[in-house]
């Protein structure tokens, strides 16, 4: 059985909000797949040192061939850890509505900032799929375009509707996960 890890977003109540995504996604995956949804220390308070420690340990402990689904600031945190040298043995990384934390972006003045040459710091050959809603009310879909420019190997999909929490049908995500797990 493939290990599935869902990394929640950042800010107040992000874990609670993202639990809705997990609760809608889990039944679509079938009985053989279970999403692990730990509360990552530091994400809700946007404390990079705490996030780096807790999420770094969580990623390190994943079994080979795991799939990570990460949302919003949690997705950016996973990307930053990978850029800093974390090397979990992932089968696939799914990023949902992540802010682009480059030093040249609106999200860049934080401890979560990426190196300018982001793609050069990521694990070679790691399949990455990024989904963003065109009507995201929190993180503009223009962030997805930044990722596409900085990580051209990643598949970038702009979805019509659903907002930041991907309200509505999640079959697209379930099918993609089942296709790689």
How should each PLM-predicted stretch be described?
Residues 16, 137-143:
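Conserved alpha/beta-hydrolase "acid-adjacent" motif
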Residues 37-41, 157-163:
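Short glycine-rich catalytic loops that host catalytic nucleophiles or stabilize transition states
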Residues 45-46, 162-174:
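Catalytic histidine-centered segment of alpha/beta-hydrolase-like enzymes
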Residues 88-101:
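A conserved short beta-strand
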Residues 124, 129-132, 136:
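Short beta-strand/loop motif that positions the catalytic acidic residue
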